[in-house]
């Protein structure tokens, strides 16, 4: 059995880390330091690199909060990232080494959130099996996605198709302009305030992502004929075939025009033309999957969307 050596991540390894993500099947934009570093001062980073014979075989993006190792609190998901052909015996040894590290550092539990099933397919099944005996709870959240490979005219519900055929004189476009993103952010704050919450990202963090991730993220804005922003979305390109809507919002004064239908339809066509397979519309569950927001879920299903699950393993240290 080859010995597994652990190295704690520092920014000296940034390029090495991101290069490794690029050659793994399970790694996505949310695994990269170029994404995770937008809020590195928010959390106590405890990301790890696992090596065999001085070569990286796996990485774990993670932070520590209240004696809990979380992978990852600053992204939609985390999980151990490794090459598809990693042998089971090495995976088991990594699990054992991680256990020992947690014990030595008084870490009492691990929370590992895996990517959506459309992103990871069955890639993490071996790892989930390795962790299953230590896992005391699995929470599941569901998201809806549009299958862009089968997208065609009239794909949506009868009501949504009717809305799109009406001449509301709405136009949608992508933007990374700071002033326009600021207007989108103000609309987003107004939307979330009605639900007594606020955006996960500050405006500064949103602009950091837009400025540093090039074409991997952008804002889509829908305007009426007078130039008012009536709806919008912030989108991340997670992989080469999956785009993810992180925020969706609309101006309630224009709700009769259902502007979000236009925004999502435009984005679906936009990413289909770029060769993407999926547009993920985000989770429709609340309280870590305990409840489903049926009105939100029903809205997304009218785009002829499908469900994709995100699992979180809550793991005991023993």
Where do the language-model regions lie?
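Short, Lys/Arg-enriched, disordered terminal segments
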Residues: 1-11, 308, 316-318
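A conserved beta-strand-loop-helix scaffold within acyl/acetyltransferase catalytic domains
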Residues: 3-53, 57-68, 114-143, 149-254
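Short, high-confidence coil segments that cap the C-terminus of an alpha-helix
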Residues: 43-45, 104-107, 273-276
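Aromatic (often tryptophan-rich) hydrophobic motifs at membrane interfaces
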Residues: 49-51, 59-62, 81-99, 208, ...
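Short, flexible, mixed-charge acidic loops at enzyme active sites
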Residues: 68-73, 296
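A gly/proline- and charged-residue-enriched helix-loop-helix capping module
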Residues: 73-121
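Short, solvent-exposed loop/turn segments at the edges of secondary structure
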Residues: 73-77, 139, 308
């Amino acid at each position: 059995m080859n010995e597994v050596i652990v190295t704690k991540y520092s920014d000296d390894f940034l390029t090495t880390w991101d290069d490794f993500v690029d050659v793994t099947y399970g790694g996505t934009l949310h695994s990269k330091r170029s994404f995770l570093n937008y809020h590195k001062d928010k959390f106590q980073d405890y990301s790890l690199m696992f090596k065999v014979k001085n070569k990286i075989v796996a990485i774990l993006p993670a932070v520590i909060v209240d004696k809990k190792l979380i992978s990852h609190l600053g992204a939609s998901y985390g999980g151990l990232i490794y090459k598809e052909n990693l042998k089971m015996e090495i995976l088991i040894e990594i699990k054992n080494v991680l256990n020992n590290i947690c014990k030595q550092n008084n870490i009492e539990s691990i929370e590992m959130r895996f990517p959506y099933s459309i992103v990871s397919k069955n890639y993490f099944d071996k790892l989930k099996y390795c962790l299953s005996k230590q896992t005391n709870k699995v929470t599941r959240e569901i998201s809806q996605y549009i299958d862009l490979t089968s997208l065609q005219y009239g794909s949506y519900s009868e009501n949504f198709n009717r809305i799109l055929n009406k001449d509301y004189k709405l136009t949608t476009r992508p933007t990374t302009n700071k002033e326009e993103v600021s207007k989108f952010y103000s609309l987003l704050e107004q939307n979330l305030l009605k639900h007594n919450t606020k955006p996960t990202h500050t405006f500064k963090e949103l602009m950091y992502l837009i400025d540093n991730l090039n074409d991997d993220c952008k804002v889509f804005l829908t305007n009426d004929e007078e130039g008012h922003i009536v709806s919008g979305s912030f989108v991340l390109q997670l992989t080469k075939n999956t785009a993810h809507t992180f925020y969706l919002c609309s101006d309630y004064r224009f709700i009769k025009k259902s502007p979000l239908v236009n925004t999502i339809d435009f984005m679906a066509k936009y990413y289909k033309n770029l060769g993407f397979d999926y547009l993920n519309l985000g989770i429709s569950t609340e309280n870590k999957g305990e409840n489903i927001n049926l009105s939100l879920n029903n809205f997304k299903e009218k785009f002829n969307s499908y469900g994709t699950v995100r699992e979180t393993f809550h793991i005991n240290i023993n």
